[in-house]
């Protein structure tokens, strides 16, 4: 699977395994994403092919294997969290947290490393909705700081994953979403820079300088 993940267009191999029935035996959690349910004439998107599109989008931006795993698993809990709410439509509340909790079991079954790489993928899956939420509300410094703290050094990878998650066929929507993410990215980096300056402490203070030079 990892050889397929690292291909320029990973969806080709996964789609072939799916159509031949092989994928169901080696990765049933991924196959469970396939299909569209309807209620009151409303259907949700096919999350299997959406996931493959996200993976392809990301493959065009990053060659990091574990980030590609994150793309493959970002919506893995949608079957378990799928609900139809009257007046709202299909929802997948909590699929980020439930998906993160599923990652260790999937890694164990796939005989993947259960170390910092696992933790990284869990983090990406758990946080993949957070930047989206920031674009839909008034952005406060406290909300930005929470995301900075939780994403840590993996912030740019998280934003790449979020941008890859845009699979709309409407060019205007894609442009709008990308602009929203760019705004969030800029606000995050501006805040990070301000906080770094605010929290920086000089190695010596003014009193010490005066004492050294006999100015006190």
Which residues does each predicted region cover?
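A generic short alpha-helical patch detector that favors 3-5-residue windows
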Residues: 46, 95, 136, 150, ...
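Histidine/acidic-rich helix-loop-helix segments that form or flank divalent-metal centers
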Residues: 36-45, 52-56, 112-174
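Glycine- and charge-enriched loop/helix tracts that form the active or gating conduit
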Residues: 1-72, 76-94, 98-116, 205
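Feature representing long, continuous alpha-helical segments
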Residues: 70-74, 97, 101, 105, ...
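Charged substrate- and nucleic-acid-binding regions of tRNA-handling and nucleotidyl-transfer enzymes
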Residues: 103-109, 167-216
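A residue-level signal for conserved active-site and pocket-lining positions in enzyme catalytic cores
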Residues: 16-17, 54, 99, 125, ...
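Intrinsically disordered or highly flexible coil/loop and linker segments, enriched in small
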Residues: 7-14, 23-26, 63-64, 82, ...
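A ubiquitous short alpha-helical element
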Residues: 38-39, 87-91, 148-149, 189-196, ...
